[in-house]
Amino acid sequence: MARFSPQDLADHLKDGLLSFPATAFQDDLEVDEVAYVEHIEWQSSYPVAGLFAAGGTGEGFSLTVEENHRVTQLAVQASSPEVPVLGSATGSTKSAIANAQGAEAAGAEGVLLLPPYLTECDAEGLYNHAAAVCESTSLGVIVYNRANAIYSPEVIARLSERYPNFIGFKDGTGNIEHLAKITTLCGDRLFYLGGLPTAETFALPLLQMGMSTYSSAMFNFIPDFALSFYADVRAQDSAAVKQKLSDFVLPYLDIRDRAQGYGVSIVKGGLKAVGRNAGGVRPPLRNLSEQDIADLSDLLATSGAGSYRLPVEVKA
């Protein structure tokens, strides 16, 4: 039974940092439930506003429907009571509905609707896809605007008018004109979150567009640094943001961009670099090379991001 109504969930999520926990795998690439539970317990010990299980960073695209449900269930059970867990819905409409209903059965508070896999969609098709998911669950639904799932402003407005449990718009395109049209049409009926890869890079300018939060992949392995960065963004401390970008985030991007798919792989490389192993990634992704991990370890050390600690009163 969800503790948050859809609107209460939106109000909660928009005022804090969000993250997508990596899904731990064993050497045979089966889900490592023990390591995953430990990871969720560690992540939820920080003042993060919400954790999205089986999302992009959690390799939800590589999980079966059954694994998606189990991973979400484990996250709900392991998370601190103060930190809501949301599920992720992906694939075909039928699969996305199964994911959403599985998340609700697991006790999740909401669901993120990811783009359908490898299919072209027009506006009406995307409306029907999102509408079917909204109708299938009482949980709050957030759509992810990215890749082949570019929701027109008119579709977002229709969804927000028709479905009270449609609560959020996550953008992974960075199209400012598109975002401006949506925020103008929908206003504070929805909450808006940044979903570009390594979202810290864009967080400060997007704050001016009404995006008060974003999904932080690096929270997986340097949560103190990620929360400090978010605090600087919300305070609009441009000097502090630029310093952190220069010291860590931009060099981190250089490592991430060495190979396609490293946006997910580097998170597990980061966990390994800080002594927390969530295993490798499933194909078709590939793991960071040993040199990549060594370079990331050096960057974490020289930038101070790996040893950064929040003041106790902030972390409590």
Curated annotation (Swiss-Prot):
Q: Where is the signal peptide?
A: none
Pfam families, alphabetically?
A: DHDPS
Please state the pathway this protein functions in, per its UniProt record: Carbohydrate acid metabolism; D-glucarate degradation; 2,5-dioxopentanoate from D-glucarate: step 2/2
Assigned keywords, A-Z = Lyase
Enzyme type, top EC level:
lyase
State the superkingdom.
Bacteria
Cited SMART domains: DHDPS
Question: What S-S linkages are listed for this chain?
Answer: none
From the record, what ranges are coiled-coil?
none
Which GO biological process entries does UniProt record here? D-glucarate catabolic process
GO MF, one annotated term? 5-dehydro-4-deoxyglucarate dehydratase activity
Q: Its Enzyme Commission number?
A: 4.2.1.41
Q: Does the keyword Lyase apply?
A: yes
Regarding protein family, the annotation reads: Belongs to the DapA family.
Any idea what this protein is called? Probable 5-dehydro-4-deoxyglucarate dehydratase
Q: What organism is the protein native to?
A: Corynebacterium glutamicum (strain R)
